Amino acid sequence: MSGIDIVFFDAGETLLHPHPSFPELFARIAQSQGHDVSVEDATEVQRRLAPHLVDLAEDTGVENPSFQAEDSARFWSFLYRRLLKELGIEDEGLVSALYKTFSDISSYALFDDVLPALRGLEAEGYRLGLISNFEEWLEEMLVELEIGHLFEVRIVSGVEGVEKPDPRIYQLALDRAGAQAQAAVHVGDSPAMDVEPAAAAGIKPVLLDRLGRYRDHPGTVISGLDELAGAVSALAREPHDSRTPPVRAEGS
């Protein structure tokens, strides 16, 4: 094993995702409520609003949506209303149905590359950790998905009372793991919530760009977790210096 000791992961859209997909579930629920919404419609609305999610999240008026159930409901219901507005739909019953569906453990599955990647890293001697902005029921979902036991450290914002990008959540993870920042990697799908705050904490970040949204990102980028072992090895060979040239994993 290299100078890297532990690899932390984000959860949503990194390890797990709505199953079969967010647009498919969204369209299915809308259709069940009598609305003519196709998967293509839902996909297009998601694509259009995705770059503005940080701003939309601020518009909800909920500062920490994962801490309390009522705040979670307010936060996500606001976002679902915004998505529906793009489709010309106003239906509070549908908003409630969407919130119920996407708050149900059975609506989620692991990406196909997750277990091979986690087991491969374990076999190489790396410890595994989790740092996620999620309600406390993520803990139960990790057990249901049979990966909870793989993480030596699990930092879930709804349990700990601190959310990304607050640097304290990264320091908490390092403290729990007994790890040094320069010996840690964090993998996530968001530049703002994963890459930038992890780097600010001294952790080596890896951006997981499954949909090819961040081709010009100036850092370590992978398109799937099958590329992660190579990226971690490359990062381990770099000096701990912010001036180090960026790495792009092969195949990304």
Regions found by a protein language model. Give the residues of each.
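Asp-based, Mg2+/Mn2+-dependent phosphohydrolase catalytic module
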Residues: 1-7, 40, 89-95, 115, ...
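N-terminal helical cap/lid subdomain that shapes the substrate entry/recognition surface
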Residues: 2-115, 124
